[in-house]
Regions:
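Residues that scaffold the ATP/ADP-binding catalytic core of kinase and kinase-like folds
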Residues: 24-25, 144
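A short alpha->loop->secondary-structure connector
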Residues: 11, 29-40
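Conserved beta-strand signature within the Rossmann-like core of class I S-adenosyl-L-methionine
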Residues: 11-23
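Substrate-binding/catalytic lobe of Class I Rossmann-like enzymes that use SAM or dcSAM, i.e.
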Residues: 39-112
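Single conserved hydrophobic/aromatic residue that forms the stacking wall/gate
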Residues: 1-13
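Short aromatic-enriched loop/helix-cap "lid" or pocket-rim segments at secondary-structure transitions
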Residues: 25-29, 62-63
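Residue-level signature of catalytic and energy-coupling elements of molecular machines
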Residues: 18, 69, 137
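C-terminal lobe and adjacent flexible extensions of AdoMet/dcAdoMet transferase-like proteins
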Residues: 73, 91-149
Length: 149
């Protein structure tokens, strides 16, 4: 996130990373690789794997494949959020305990959001109280954050 958030970068940024990391940067909700990294990258940039680099291309050969990922920075974030810092705290809390519901993972995270406030926000959004962070889109995390500000 720090690389993408950095204001000194140009509009397009390319970096070679482990293939697993590149996959996590570009995946969406409901997939096993979706998490805080996916959301952070997708808040600041449009990620796209442009080249897969097999481990056999390196000497000595590493144990993992690599990928070149292209990050095209957004001029403005794709979602309107009142407090980025709060949104990312909620996102991190949601994925710290992946298999727990949002009520339990965020409500017990110590970030200052009560289960009651979270219940009200989720109900306002029309989401079930049993929802997990891995099911929410970036837009839904922004909306949730805005309701909890």
């Amino acid at each position: 996130r720090d690389d993408v958030e950095s204001r000194g970068l140009g509009d397009v940024y390319k970096r070679q990373v482990q293939k697993e990391v590149a996959d996590r940067m570009q995946c969406g909700p409901g997939t096993k690789d979706y998490g805080a990294l996916s959301l952070a990258v997708q808040f600041y940039a449009r990620p796209k794997v442009v080249l897969n680099v097999p481990a056999s291309c390196f000497m000595p050969r590493p144990n993992v494949d690599s990928a070149v990922i292209r990050l095209e920075r957004f001029k403005t974030p794709p979602v309107d959020v009142k407090n980025e810092h709060l949104m990312f705290k909620i996102i991190r809390a949601s994925f710290n305990q992946r298999r727990k519901t949002m009520l339990n993972s965020v409500g017990n995270s110590g970030i200052g959001i009560t289960k009651e406030a979270l219940t009200n926000a989720l109900e306002t959004m029309g989401l079930p109280l049993t929802i997990r962070g891995e099911a929410l889109t970036l837009e839904q995390f922004a909306q949730l954050s805005n309701l909890l500000c």
